[in-house]
Amino acid sequence: MRKLDNKFSWKNATFMARLSYHAYNGEDEFRKEFSKGSKGWKDISFFSNGGTECFVLTCPKNYIVVFRGTQPTSWEDIKADVQFHKQKKEYAVNSTGTKAIGKVHRGFKAALNDIWDVLLDHYKQNGQGKQLLVTGHSLGAALATLYADRIADMHSVCYTFGSPRVGNKELIDNMNFTCYRLRNNNDIVTRVPPEWIGYTHKSDALKYFNVDGIVHHGFSRGYMFGQWIKGTYRTLMRDKTWDAFADHSMGDYYKLCRRQLIKEEIEI
C-alpha cells in the first residue's frame, strides 16, 4: 500500500470517501472491503460505544481514523446531532498543561467522549510518529474534526464530507491541524448548527461541488447562493423533491470524488 501524505489530492480524497462510505456497512463488511488483496490493510481495529463507531487502519507509515456518520435509526446519533448547546473544549493530547480554548458542540463532544479513552490508548501505542489522517461523513465528520483537535498533531490531516459546524470561532481558530472540507451543493447538514448562534466551520481548503458536480475551490457566499437557487429549482421542477437532503448522501460524495479523480488522471 502507498503512503498517504498530508497534501490534498483527489486520490487521497477518494480513498477517504471510500472509507467513510463503507463505515456505514458495519465491522464485517468494512474489514472485508479493506483487507482483501495483496495491498489490503492487515491491521484494522474497530471501536464502538454508546452509538459512536470508529475504525482505525494502521501500517508502518500511516495511521487512519474513520468515524461512522449518523444512522437515522439510532437515537444516540440523533441525540448527538441535536444537542447544540456549546461547552468548553477538552484538553489536547499533545498540549498537556495548555489552557483549553474555545467552545464545542455538546452532543459531538459527548459522542467522542464515549470512545475517547480507548482511541487515545490505541493512538499512543500505534499512531505516534506516523502520518495521521482522520475522516468521516455527517456526524462522523464532526467527530473526525474534534478527534484531530484533541490529538493536536500539527501534521495531521482531516478530510470531512458533509460536515456540520462543530464549535465557535475561538475553537476553530485555535485548531492546529489541516482540514480539507468537501461539500456537495445544497447539503443541508453543512449549514447546521446555524452561524447566528455562534457556530463556524473548520475549513482550510473547501472543495465545493456545484449543482452540476463541478468543483469550486474556496468559499464564496454569492456563488454558493446562486447554486442553491439553481439546485433547488432544478430538483423541485424535475424530481419534485428538495435536494438539500439528497445532496447529503455519502454515496454521492464518493461518486463525485471518483469522478474528479478520473478527470484529473485523464488530463495528466
Predicted feature residues:
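Non-catalytic, mobile gating and regulatory segments of ester bond hydrolases
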Residues: 1-135, 139-268
